[in-house]
Every structure is written in structure tokens, then in C-alpha cells.
Amino acid sequence: MNKISTKKAICILSGGMDSTLSSYIAKKDGFEIIAVHFNYGQRTQNRELKAFRDICNELDIKSKYEIDIPFFTQIGANALTDMSIDVPTGGLEAGVPITYVPFRNGIFLAITAAIAEKEGATAMYIGVVQEDSSGYPDCTEEFIQDMKKAINQGTKEDTKIEIITPLVHLSKAQIVQEAIKLNVPLELTWSCYKEEEEACGVCDSCRLRLNGFEQAGKKDPIKYKEFQ
């Protein structure tokens, strides 16, 4: 009897709402999921790692990578890995915010591509959001397509990897609605840039998340120190 081969996808899973939904969509799409998480010296590294592990358990993911890339703290120039720079709490501003980690998603995708090539995966899922987001330049559809081209040019000839961005043109409200529809355990996810016990409620990430729940007419299941 021939063994049925399963198609594999590498899911970049931070433990946040977007990457978690993206991973659930990969499961719905019929992929065997290999999860990748990056510890890059961010303020909420320990809390995000806990969220990642909890979500992997919920998805029954057998194969996962926890990759340490501490050099982001040496580069600095952002409020997530440079503790001398305060995380903004006054609301979303125009332009690229100080919470943007220089070329983070490009580096994440490059490392994930190496894992995909090793594992024989045909797809990589990343939960970037272009429309209703902080405006990071490495979250656009154009950037992802350029990275896909570079990855497929820079890997073995028989390696063909699709980068799937199921949320890129969704609003936060649509993300909340889709997550609820797919029974995503949103109570296990973590989005806050500042805190690890209770979400601050005032950083850009908390504001975007709370706005999404409000616009979707739903209550966020996690606790907040304060509301915007």
C-alpha cells in the first residue's frame, strides 16, 4: 500500500492574532504545518514564546523551530529591541513608526526559506497585514512577491516555494471575524508590544487589535491594563 504524501507548509508564528489565524488557514488548506518562531530580543519575547507553544499545542503541531536571532538588539533603531527607546502609546501616527524593526520580515522569510528547503515544504505562510496596520514597509504584498522571487532564485532548482499571505488585504475587523469562524483560540494569542502580564491597551499593536474587535462587534478575550 502506497503511503499518502502530505504537503508541508512552514508557518511563521509569532503568537499574535494575525500569525495564528494564518496558521489556522494553512491547516484548513490541508497542509501539514511546521511552525517557526523567532526570539529576536523583543520586549515581550517570553510572553510571545508562551503563546507560540500554546498555539502549537492547540494545532497539534509536531514539528516546530524556535530560532534565536539576538542580533536585532545590536542593530537597535526600534522600540521593540532597543530598551532605550520608548514604545509609543499616543496612538497611530503617519509614516513608519519607531516600532518597525529594520527588515525583520525579510530576515524571517530568508531563514524560513532555508527551513522550507530542508523540510521539502512547498509553501510558507506569513500573517502580514498591509491595509489596516502600522504601515511597515516589509508587510506589503509587493515586498512579499519580491522576496518570493529572490527565494526561488536562490534555492535549489527543484525547490519551488509559494509565500502565502492570506490576511494581507484584510482589515483587523475581518481578521477577528475570520478567526472566530475558524475557532482560533484568541485568548491564547499575544499582541502587546510592551507588557507580558496584562496587555497595555495603548501601544499601536493593542490599539489595532482592540479596534478590530470593536469594529467586529466582539469582545477581546485577553485582559488589558487600560483601554484606549
Curated annotation (Swiss-Prot):
Biological processes per GO annotation: queuosine biosynthetic process
Manner of cofactor binding, per the entry note: Binds 1 zinc ion per subunit.
Catalytic reaction annotation: 7-carboxy-7-deazaguanine + NH4(+) + ATP = 7-cyano-7-deazaguanine + ADP + phosphate + H2O + H(+)
EC numbers: 6.3.4.20
This protein's pathway: Purine metabolism; 7-cyano-7-deazaguanine biosynthesis
UniProt binding sites for ATP: L13, S14, G15, G16, M17, D18, S19, T20, L21, S22, S23
Pfam short name (any one): QueC
UniProt keyword terms in alphabetical order: ATP-binding, Ligase, Metal-binding, Nucleotide-binding, Queuosine biosynthesis, Zinc
Chain segments annotated as coiled-coil in the UniProt record: none
Binding positions for Zn(2+) per the UniProt entry: C192, C200, C203, C206
GO molecular function terms attached to this record: ATP binding; ligase activity, forming carbon-nitrogen bonds; zinc ion binding
Cofactor(s) of this protein: Zn(2+)
Summary of the function given for this chain in its UniProt record: Catalyzes the ATP-dependent conversion of 7-carboxy-7-deazaguanine (CDG) to 7-cyano-7-deazaguanine (preQ(0)).
Family that this chain belongs to: Belongs to the QueC family.
Matching NCBIfam families: 7-cyano-7-deazaguanine synthase QueC (TIGR00364)
The protein's name in its UniProt record: 7-cyano-7-deazaguanine synthase
Species per Swiss-Prot/TrEMBL record: Aliarcobacter butzleri (strain RM4018)
Species lineage: Bacteria, Pseudomonadati, Campylobacterota, Epsilonproteobacteria, Campylobacterales
Gene assigned in the entry: queC
